Design a protein with these regions (language model features):
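Glycoside hydrolase catalytic-domain groove-lining segments
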Residues: 267, 272-366
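Active-site groove signature of glycoside hydrolases
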Residues: 130-135, 139-142, 152-224, 245-257
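Short, well-ordered beta-strand segments enriched in hydrophobic/aromatic residues
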Residues: 454, 481-489, 650-658
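Active-site-adjacent substrate/metal-binding segments within catalytic domains
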Residues: 26-116
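Aromatic-lined substrate-binding rim segments of carbohydrate-active enzymes
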Residues: 77-151, 155, 233-249, 325
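A solvent-exposed, charged loop/short amphipathic helix patch at secondary-structure junctions
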Residues: 148-154, 201-228, 309-325, 360-374
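Surface-exposed, glycine/proline- and aromatic-rich loop segments on solvent-exposed faces
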Residues: 465-611, 666-698
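Aromatic-rich peripheral "rim/lid" segments of glycoside hydrolase catalytic domains that contact
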Residues: 360-369, 373-378, 389-465, 723-725, ...
């Protein structure tokens, strides 16, 4: 009996050892070594073939975000995926692209959706690089970098073949993966937008590792160490899938303009800090790799616009005449053509598009396809024109970024203003990265609490906050906006000016207001200071110290101003925008100056003055406090997603984004504390704000300000899905003859 137990224990130990080695090293036993290796995808010249027929990839990127959750929560369920797959295919797309290993619900849903479908929805699957490793001290040959990529790649291959009984990871999705979805997987996009410093550091530290000779991939004599690392990773994964599953599929390595293969003019390289290259032409395939490689790039029209930069500085752009449309230089199509002409393999633009967001991070100098500040209609038009540019450049396919909005995302020019641990719980229309989706998540279970559309029905049972001088103010709020309704007897839009002071923080504010315009450095001349010498005195005083002043002054001149002490841009970016140290001479707590609310942009439209007059970056800004007139109801035929206010007779509706009012986390009603007490942005809780309203012609010049209690919703935001115009625009393009 003891011998039997000992034998059983040894067998169990061997099984456990095999399972461990299979999981950690990819060890496996091929029980059918003579089986032929097959592939339903191939490359022929610059064309992708599926089942032997030319195939244009028309795809949509799909993230993992859903309101109330971070990406690593992997909170999207099977039923949601099934619904989305149907909507995507009905749009005319034939492919989705995901970036990393997801929860098992995704693969279950993908199998369920495709198993009996004559025309399947295909998949391009990504392989993610851990953020900590990417931005750490390691080069790409470090076991924590290359080793982790290969290990995760083997796990991914097993998952796609339904052969991963259980997978558990700190950063990746987990679960039981038993569905074989490999018949519908076109290929892999390995890696991410490579960090240029990692590429350069690897090439510097590992100079002797600049070649690789594998069974399926090898490098040319011109390869860099980083490219050799990519070849090794790709070869190891192709080998694993070939030997274990006797299958192959397309392979691409992620890339973007920051590490494109070109040598740019010295001024371009210096301005955009372009110092690293990844050239996949240096990675070659052997005859054993049946599927072949394609090229993957993320390319957006607004940044980094190398060719547009050259053009605006008067530098020669080769064959510029080919890309002139109605007198406008289409630098986006010119760059796409450069990329496609350079490569010998099929080129797929695996990210393109623009966000339908109120906030902006970069303006497109040529074709108006900017990173934010775009309405949903403009987003749709940009998606179509970008797709057409990609196809005219000769690319083999495209993948739109992205399917759904992602509230957890951050943008470099607003992230200092928000609590980044709470972003999934509210909708920040100032942060453009959250709103690339053609599927929007709007606040409210079925509809928003209020729309700025001139329909006052939703205000019927809302109590008044302020009543004075024939003027009434009411307020509602949700996960995206604080919405106000002002009723004024005999209101004359365009003639009467209304003022709405708001007291958000008890730390600062002023009872009087002088409207001033702090000039950014790029608008100043000589030794002119940032503060303008003259200002417009507001003909009212406020009952309480106000931090913001809403000025309703007609269709094109209505705006929100911020008291100088509470200007977030000054506190965070003064050195880049105003060329001044914000903390050497801070504004007084009760400073009377109220200034425009601006967002910093990445690159000026015309960088010439910056290059000529300054020895450092001087940022251009975007006036985000300027209010846009229009109808903000998606059900209306004249819907404008950027509409801030609407007027109907004696009634005005205004919606104010939370971040515009310095709320860092409205889900818990947290606002910015005094910047100059903390040397930066710190939070403080509030339970409400004070708000008032008056006309410049009011008899009473001391504006009454009443208390508006505010209560957060915690980590349980409400939302409903809505397909944006971009969905229907692409559907018309892709499905109609």
């Amino acid at each position: 009996m003891k011998r039997f137990l000992a034998v059983c224990a040894c067998l169990l130990a061997l099984v456990l050892l095999y399972l461990f080695l299979a999981d950690k090293t990819g060890l496996y036993i091929d029980w059918n070594p003579g089986r032929e290796t097959t592939s339903f995808t191939r490359v022929e010249g610059k064309t992708i073939l599926v089942d032997g027929e030319p195939f244009e990839i028309r795809g949509v990127d799909m993230g993992v975000g859903i309101p109330g959750h971070f990406a690593t929560d992997y909170a999207i369920d099977r039923e949601t995926y099934l619904r989305w797959f149907g909507q995507i295919q009905e749009m005319g797309a034939n492919c989705i692209r995901v970036y990393t290993i997801l929860q098992d619900d995704f693969y279950e849903a993908f199998y369920e959706y495709n198993k009996d479908r004559e025309e399947p929805l295909y998949l391009l699957h990504g392989l993610w690089v851990n953020d900590y490793v990417m931005y750490s001290h390691r080069d790409a040959f470090d076991p924590e970098y290359l080793g982790a990529l290969i290990e995760d790649g083997r796990t991914l291959i097993d998952i796609l073949h339904g052969n991963k009984t259980f997978s558990l990871s700190e950063d990746l999705g987990s679960g039981a993966y038993t569905r074989d979805i490999s018949p519908w997987v076109l290929g892999y996009i390995l890696g991410v937008e490579w960090e240029d410093t990692t590429v350069a550091y690897t090439d510097h530290m590992q100079k002797e590792k600049n070649s690789y000779q594998g069974e399926y991939l090898f490098t040319s004599e011109d390869a860099s160490p980083f490219e050799a690392m990519l070849a090794q990773m790709g070869d190891r994964l192709i080998s694993y899938e070939t030997r274990k599953y006797h299958a192959q599929r397309l392979v691409a390595f992620a890339n973007w303009p920051t590490t494109d293969p070109f040598d740019w003019e010295e001024q371009v390289s210096a301005y955009f800090r372009k110092f690293a290259k990844v050239d996949v032409e240096h990675i070659r395939s052997t005859e054993k790799f049946l599927s072949g490689q394609f090229v993957s790039y993320h390319i957006y029209p607004y940044f980094p616009d190398y060719l547009g930069f050259q053009d605006v500085l008067g530098q020669e752009v080769p064959q510029k005449y080919r890309f002139m449309e109605n007198g406008v230089f289409n630098s986006y199509r010119a760059y796409l053509s450069m990329i496609n002409d350079y490569h010998t393999m099929p080129v797929v633009v695996s990210e393109y598009g623009v966000p339908a967001a109120r906030g902006r991070a970069q303006t497109d100098r040529n074709t108006g396809r900017s990173q934010g500040g775009m309405s949903e209609k403009e987003q749709a038009e940009a998606a179509v024109s970008c797709y057409e540019d990609i196809m005219k450049a000769g690319c083999a396919g495209s993948v739109l970024f992205t399917w759904q909005d992602e509230w957890f995302k951050r943008t470099w020019n607003t992230m200092a203003y928000s609590d980044l641990t709470k972003t999934p719980y509210w909708c920040d229309v100032q942060t453009n990265e959250q709103h690339f989706g053609i599927l929007a998540f709007d606040p409210g279970k079925e509809r928003c609490v209020s729309y700025v559309d001139g329909d006052m029905e939703e205000w019927e049972n809302v109590p008044a906050v302020v009543e004075q001088d024939g003027l009434t103010l009411q307020a509602l709020y949700d996960e995206a906006y604080l919405t106000l309704r002002i009723h004024k007897e005999g209101y004359r839009f365009g003639e009467d000016t209304l003022y709405v002071p708001l007291d958000v923080t008890p730390r600062s504010g002023s009872k009087t207001a002088v409207e001033q315009d702090r000039k950014p450095a790029y608008e100043r001349q000589g030794s002119e200071s940032a503060a303008s010498e003259e200002g417009t005195i507001v003909p009212l005083t406020f009952e309480r110290p106000a931090d913001f002043l809403l000025v309703l002054d007609g269709r094109d001149n209505s705006r929100v101003l911020v008291q100088e002490r509470y200007e977030a841009l000054r506190a965070v970016y003064s050195h880049l925008v105003y060329a001044e140290d914000a903390y050497l001479n801070p504004p007084a707590v009760d400073a009377t100056a109220f200034v425009p609310i601006r967002l910093m942009l990445q690159v000026p439209l015309n960088p010439g003055p910056e290059l000529e007059n300054f020895g450092y970056d001087i940022a251009e800004t975007f006036d985000t406090g300027l209010l846009r007139y229009g109808n903000g109801n998606p059900s209306s035929p004249d819907y404008d997603s950027l509409a801030d206010f609407c007027v109907n007779g004696d009634d005005i509706e205004i919606r104010l984004p939370w971040l515009l009012l310095n709320f860092s986390n409205p889900s818990e009603m947290m606002v910015h504390d005094d910047y100059y007490l903390h040397y930066g942005v710190e939070e403080m809780p509030i339970e409400g704000i004070y708000v008032g309203a008056a006309s410049e012609k009011s008899v009473r010049k001391d504006v009454q300000m009443a208390y508006l209690p505010l209560k957060g919703w915690g980590s349980q935001p409400t939302f409903h899905e809505r397909l944006r115009e971009g969905y229907y625009a692409l559907q018309r393009l892709w499905t109609e003859p």
